[in-house]
Amino acid sequence: MTILAWCIAWVLDFIIGDPQHWPHPVRWIGRLITFVQRIVRRYCPGDKALRIGGGVMWVVVVGVTWGVAWGVLALAQRIHPWFGWSVEVWMIFTTLAGRSLARAAQEVERPLRENDLAESRIKLSWIVGRDTSQLQPAQIYRAVVETVAENTVDGIIAPLFFLFLGGAPLAMAYKAVNTLDSMVGYKHEKYRAIGMVSARMDDVANYLPARLSWLLLGIAAGLCRLSGWRALRIGWRDRYNHSSPNCAWSEACVAGALGIQLGGPNNYFGERVDKPWIGDAQRGISVDDISRTIRLMWVASTLALALFIAARCGLSGVA
């Protein structure tokens, strides 16, 4: 039943994703973060106090998320086993973001194909932190490919990894870790202190999933009739070409698979950030690379699901 729940949740994400107006735990987690952050800022003046308060915030948000998820599942199981199973499926479904990621990328791709640069910049600004107002088409292609490659890890592979380790409650706790990093894990002045713990713990949580993504995306590249060997080679060579210890693993693998170059300089919150280049520019990046990256994401996520199902069966002795 557990494996069936994983599969149904994955299929639901593949088919419908996260409908915009449906209730979603990540939105609730975001409200909790905003509430706790407001309290921390009120009572923790100065960088040192904010770093400590940010650590407390991380513990509170992640702990509450895990506890509520565990409690809701336990209560649902007591009401009826089938109800508990249904709640588990829903909870797992909400931790996966493959369809939402694909849809967001396609929302940028569509106006690009219609030569509507202004609209594509607006749609891109919804999913990236960089300044998109002056980006040219090739820069937009690069931003979308990087976003899909990076979020293949924290939107699909990592939730499945923590689902395998600790069930739906741990997968939900991971989403809290990831949401904390998304909201406060920045290096500029406003968040540097309060978000330090959140940023570092997100690095810890994604350490193994990011490295697993290198292998899965490399295999996916071969299955998609791209260069799997080049994906693995470039992914390994450029794995540290990023300020994050995790992001370049998936980005470099995708760059190698497609034969393009990612990374480079960008503007974040009014500040220029010079990132190392990732991959070799064997050809110029094109709008078609967006759909190719989405396909790589789906194949890699399918491989991840199959891997964790096989591992679960092996550990439980199920043939």
Curated annotation (Swiss-Prot):
Pathway(s) served: Cofactor biosynthesis; adenosylcobalamin biosynthesis; adenosylcobalamin from cob(II)yrinate a,c-diamide: step 4/7
Gene Ontology BP terms: cobalamin biosynthetic process
Protein name, per record: Cobalamin biosynthesis protein CbiB
A GO cellular component annotation in the UniProt record: plasma membrane
UniProt function note: Converts cobyric acid to cobinamide by the addition of aminopropanol on the F carboxylic group. However, the true cosubstrate could be (R)-1-amino-2-propanol O-2-phosphate, leading to cobinamide phosphate.
The UniProt record lists the keyword Cell membrane: yes
Keyword Membrane: yes
InterPro entries noted in UniProt: Cobalamin_biosynth_CobD/CbiB
Membrane topology: Multi-pass membrane protein
Annotated HAMAP family: CobD_CbiB
Source organism (scientific name): Salmonella typhi
Keywords, in A-Z order: Cell membrane, Cobalamin biosynthesis, Membrane, Transmembrane, Transmembrane helix
Pfam families in alphabetical order: CobD_Cbib (PF03186)
Span of the signal peptide: none
Cell compartments where the protein resides: Cell membrane
Transmembrane segments: 52-74, 79-101, 155-177, 207-229, 296-318
Family: Belongs to the CobD/CbiB family.
GO molecular-function terms, A-Z: ABC-type vitamin B12 transporter activity; threonine-phosphate decarboxylase activity
Domain of life: Bacteria
NCBIfam families: cobal_cbiB
